[in-house]
Amino acid sequence: MITVLDVENTTCKRDGKQHFDPFEAENELVMIGMLSEDTETVVTFTHSDEEPTVGGDVITQDILDATTLLVCHNAVHDLTWIWECGFKYDGKIYDTMLGEYILNKGVKSPLNLGFVSAQYQLEEQKLDTMSDYWKSGTSTKDIPFDELDEYLRYDLRSTLGVYKKQMKRFANEENSSMQSVLDLTMDTCFELALIYKRGIKVDMVELNKVKTEFEEERATLSEELNEFVEELMGDTPFNINSPEQLSTLVFSRKPTDKKQWALSVNAFMSDSAFKDAMRSMTGPVYKTKASKCFMCNGTGMVQLLTKKGTPRKNKNICKECNRQGFTLKNTKELAGLKFTPPKATWASASGFSTGKGILETLEATARGKGMEREGDFLQKLRRLNAIESYLSSFVGGIEKFTKADGMLHVQLTQHITSTARLSGRNPNMQNMPRGGTFPVKRVFISRWKGGKIMEADFGQLEFRVAAYLSQDKTAIKEVLEGFDVHQYTADIITKAGQAIGRQNAKMHTFAPLYGASGYGRTPAEAEYYTHFMYKYRGIAEWHKRLATEALSDRKITTPSGRQFAFPDVSRRRDGTVTNFTMI
């Protein structure tokens, strides 16, 4: 029996974040709606105006026991709620949200039920009043029962309608290759729901220790960096966490008119045009020397007099120093590290970029020229940025989303990316550095006494997959021999004049596998991309075949049967293809 299921539940707000899951003690299951063989069943559990359905637990479980395919829109949410409330279901599922995601073939489009239903021109019309209730802070269980009941029944009928429409589309010959992808996606969805429900245990005491370690390291780094900043910039007030101010320190220049600069500079302009823009639209930054403001005597405030010559009741802000208590004098000595941005890809709307990759390149350049202090400064700056990220993304995320029972339920979603890659949220733990030395990993413990946690990772997975798909003979030979491609990448770039380690070289190993070129990169990095296309000619030819397929068919079908659409792809005058890295 096919059963469409949807739940209505309350939510709560904690630490500025709205929580929809059943793991929060405050959240309650309000209603479950089920539609089977034209029979609608709505079971009420906790509504302010309606008594719970007599025997509701038994009714719900009986329907689930008779179900062979459970259809939902956002199945992870619905499955988690019914499981956490004690109901059992381990049969097949179909998620209409994921079905639509597959049929979209990589083209971004809203996946909410209202939008998808409208796309299929279903007769049911969704109630607009629900969003008004929720925006006003009304709890789901306090929404008038008749309106909530109608809303739930609409969702059931709409989900069923979408399911039937999708089944017809998957049956079409043009989409038939995606049937195996559909089956795998739904099986994966079920397993991801189980992973989400089970969660992982967090040692909050250890988390606080890690937080303290990071905060202490941040304080030490900030102090050391600010000492050198004062040496580089003089007495100019400086916030090392400001990308705009950091840009002036690193490149010793800033736009004279930021608005005009942002309008004039783009990543595709020629190197000569960029250099001309930099000469005409930016100016040098000089060190300053501070002296006590003579107008306010260093207080930042001045006492003005009335027309009668008596002091005014309130003091005014000193216009000479703008309340700072000091004025700055230009020393005519160039400030900062004096690096020169080589090309337009290094520009930003407010000056020049100081992203991770650029700082890595500049550090290597500094050390290559024997500028060890500058290299150390840039290394510490990158470490400070990493610490800030660890504290906000990992420590802060774990603090915010760990439940009262010490369990963290990280969700891996299947419908966010265009490529079908899983993405993490609440919090996203996918960017956690590899290796057992990363301190945050200490906070995850087994829920069982004496239990262990195993960490597993594929080695050079992208390279292996590219070797197989392209059947590149050189790449296959290196995979079989255990060749270290990341170290090879590092060696090529280093020999070309830019020192780089194996870990930082990985991004350059991966990038050409996805069709990226050396455009916009440093000369040493660009050397590797040229070398890659020559050495791995089979991969390069494979990329060209994909581009040709996208041009001729407006889509690409992968070996698994998944399809990706490229409705706007075109060939440029120079022979290259737009959207190449996406292809």
Task: List PLM regions with ranges.
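Conserved catalytic palm subdomain of right-hand nucleotidyl-transferase polymerases, strongest
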Residues: 5, 72-73, 93-97, 446-462, ...
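Active-site-proximal helix-loop-helix substrate-binding element of RNase H-like nuclease domains
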Residues: 34-172, 184, 192, 487-494
